[in-house]
Amino acid sequence: MNIRHAAPEDVPAMQAIFEYARRFMRENGNPTQWGDRFPTQEMIDRDLALHRSYVCEDEGKIAATFSFTTDGEPTYQVIRGAWLDDAPYGVVHRIAAAEGTHGAASFCMEWCMAQCGNIRIDTHADNKPMQGLLNKLGYTYCGVIELENGRGERLAFQKHA
């Protein structure tokens, strides 16, 4: 597997992965985190423009997609709980793997860790598969953050290399 910046021509494959992820979430007790239209095309376009959008390729096919930045996350400034530290960190958002892939999400998370050595991430309380992945990868539960515009709460996790 390898990671690269996403390109506009990757968007159809990324959208197919997001559609599968939404269906997977609904079928696994998490119908509201991404609903029917998240992430929006505007979010995808913004991630591409800011060079925050990545794809994971496996044998020439896009196996996963995610957003990654080391520019911080405004919603992480206030947490009910405590982050492990105040050091600079990377943020992973909108990680999703294609149907039938194995190990792509772990590979993406490990790649992000290799970029900066300190990762923060959040997920929905109903997203048990993601919580399981974070636990398997050694992330520490730090508390609860509030999304912007009153869109709800998320469980917050952090890990150091």
Model-found features: residue ranges?
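Conserved catalytic-core motifs of GNAT/GCN5-like acyltransferases
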Residues: D122, T140-R154
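Conserved acetyl-CoA-binding loop-helix of GNAT-fold acetyltransferases
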Residues: A97-A114, Q131-K136
